[in-house]
Amino acid sequence: MILSDRDIKARIAKGDIGIESEDGNHLPNIGASSMDLRLGRFFKMYKHSSIAVIDPLKEYESLTQTLEITTGEPFIIQPGEFVLAVTMEKVKIANDIVARVEGRSSLGRLGIIVHSTAGFVDAGFEGTIT
């Protein structure tokens, strides 16, 4: 079942859905059956490297750099770049609710993909969404 805006608001009021933002704005924009979340300040980018093959069983921390962006500062993503980001909001969902992360169509029309494969948020999750 997909929750409507009324259901989302009721579950927030009941404490089954919690939203806490680092900037103190606790009420996200709630759509007909969705909530808008914002990108946080931290981004992890892959450095350009000469490694032709990446083994998923190995750690490649040296290939990434973490950036902190201040409010209002632009963050430029070049075509073909891959960036990991976290939400500004910490999310808490009850054990009987799951969530999905989807991009906005306005970003999709610009060729920006919000998630590669990890769009599912498990029941009982608490934290920022990557």
Where are these regions (language model features)?
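DUTPase catalytic domain/fold
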Residues: M1-T130
